[in-house]
């Protein structure tokens, strides 16, 4: 008798990138009981070797192509900087590997289209890392929308805010990213997921350029948009990179409201439910050089370390990816590459509207 969720053979995993997310993915993969081979990579030799030692990787390299094409690698996680996803992802696809690309799928739309075309040509699965899908509160929205408690969705409102410390970390490593492409992307994905893949018809957006992030990097400090849909639905979504470094929610705060003909679901995700104040400053998990004496614990989007183990959405997403490769069973929560591409196109349309001040149709090339 065969069991569809039994992994008979081990799974070989390669992780490209040793930043906070790449390191976390590698540590999670190292702890997965079915991972029998682990390779890590970073373009900086010292970073690659240190991560390999930390997660007891079987091998490491400064060349992504070297590890993603290995015969003992089955699954590849691309967690390099946002503007360098394309080349290692393409190499992995062409080597016949199953690939998970951290959001955003790519920054340039033409690169995303090429990745999807290659995945189809080589017959491999490619996914996008939208970790928030695996958090209980956002999964609960999906389940209850599917069960009809909301009915036809009529409108939506959502916001996501980052601290300036996190924003500086993001923009300094990938100068071509934006608040929309990097951060509001989570809201675009969740909304499209709840709507069964329906995308907006138009986007109108405006952004602020009066704050510290714009002054330092030339990027918008915030972006606010209105999305309209062919069926009459409307959504108001916003992102801000303006919270002070010492803001107690040391990484991100989110709110999400979905309105329908039969009901409404509202999530207040600002982490005020677990508040700690201490004479000993608490370092931010994402930007450990930044500390605060009052902290809203749990505001690190991937999850948290406790008792030497990592718990939370990124662990569950990474496990879902590895399990899907090992069992051959598609995971129902993982975002596909096509879904990641759709979200990228919405993000790009919003940025184009903020740049031009015009309503931008989704038929815009991106």
Go through each PLM region and give its residues.
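N-terminal Rossmann-like dinucleotide-binding module
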Residues: 1-55
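C-terminal helix-rich "cap/oligomerization" subdomain common to oxidoreductases
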Residues: 1-10, 75-77, 113, 121, ...
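Predominantly a Rossmann-like dinucleotide-binding segment in NAD(P)-dependent oxidoreductases
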Residues: 21, 125, 132-219, 224-226, ...
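Conserved SAM-binding strand-loop segment of SAM-dependent methyltransferases
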Residues: 57-64
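Hydrophobic residues in well-ordered beta-strands that form the structural core
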Residues: 61, 101, 126-128, 157, ...
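Beta-strand-loop-alpha-helix segment that lines the small-molecule cofactor/substrate pocket
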Residues: 74-75, 81-82, 86-133, 148
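C-terminal glycine/acidic-rich active-site capping loop/insertion
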Residues: 131, 229, 247, 254-334, ...
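Contiguous beta-strand/loop segments that form the cofactor/metal-binding neighborhood of enzyme cores
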Residues: 182, 188-276, 318-327, 365-366
């Amino acid at each position: 008798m065969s069991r569809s969720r039994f992994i008979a053979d081990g799974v070989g995993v390669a992780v490209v990138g040793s930043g906070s997310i790449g390191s976390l993915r590698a540590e999670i993969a190292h702890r997965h009981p079915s991972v029998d081979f682990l390779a890590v990579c970073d373009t900086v030799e010292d970073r690659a070797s240190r991560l390999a030692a930390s997660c007891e990787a079987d091998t490491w390299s400064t060349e992504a192509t070297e590890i993603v094409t290995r015969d003992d690698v089955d699954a590849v996680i691309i967690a390099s900087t946002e503007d360098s996803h394309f080349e290692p992802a393409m190499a992995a696809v062409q080597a016949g590997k199953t690939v998970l690309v951290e959001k955003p799928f790519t920054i340039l739309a033409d690169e995303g289209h090429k990745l999807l075309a290659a995945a189809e040509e080589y017959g491999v699965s490619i996914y996008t890392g939208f970790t928030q899908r695996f958090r209980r509160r956002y999964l609960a929205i999906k389940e209850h929308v599917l069960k009809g408690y909301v009915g036809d969705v009529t409108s939506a409102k959502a916001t996501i805010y980052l601290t300036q410390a996190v924003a500086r970390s993001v923009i300094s490593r990938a100068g071509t990213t934006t608040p929309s492409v990097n951060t509001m992307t989570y809201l675009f994905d969740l909304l499209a997921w709840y709507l069964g893949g329906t995308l907006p018809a138009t986007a109108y957006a405006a952004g602020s350029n009066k704050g510290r992030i714009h002054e330092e990097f030339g990027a918008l400090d915030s972006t606010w948009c209105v999305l309209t849909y062919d069926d009459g639905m409307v959504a108001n979504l916003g992102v801000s990179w303006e919270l002070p470094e010492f803001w107690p929610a040391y990484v991100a705060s989110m709110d999400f409201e979905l309105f329908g003909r039969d009901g409404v679901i509202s999530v207040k995700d600002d982490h005020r439910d677990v508040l700690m104040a201490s004479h000993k400053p608490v370092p931010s998990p994402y930007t450990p050089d930044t500390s605060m004496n009052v902290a809203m614990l749990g505001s690190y989007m991937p999850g948290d370390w406790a008792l030497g183990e990592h718990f939370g959405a990124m662990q569950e997403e990474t496990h879902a990816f590895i399990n899907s490769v090992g069992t051959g069973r598609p995971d129902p929560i993982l975002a596909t590459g096509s879904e990641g591409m759709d979200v990228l196109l919405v993000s790009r349309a919003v940025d184009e509207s903020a740049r031009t001040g015009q309503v931008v149709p989704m038929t815009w090339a991106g």
